[in-house]
């Protein structure tokens, strides 16, 4: 009886302490020269790095001016399209986004104030629509500046692969 009780107690302790599952971590590299991963998988959760806009006309990229990238709405649409493409490469879609963080720089054309309506106009084309009704938890902040001097917006997301 004592042996049975001891074995049972040991088994219960093992279950109570839990067996830690191995979480597979995979880094998505944009290219060999970039010091930043496009994203990181941790189990079924994908953490995408912040995305900036692409130039409206790629041939103008070397100019590096805000006009080449557009206003907040244009930049937000560009960043969201990049996010959508990155998610698609990983077998996900915008419906899988559970958290979004948006960093907005003040728009010089708006007296240094952030263009929240511009963000919303782009955001509502991807979330809360008839075709894609899901909406992630979201935070949006005005920051003093972003890494690229022309950037008005940077968006990062967390997405989860459903079972």
Where are the language model's segments positioned?
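N-terminal presequence-like segments and the immediate start of the first folded domain
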Residues: 3-81, 85-98, 104-163
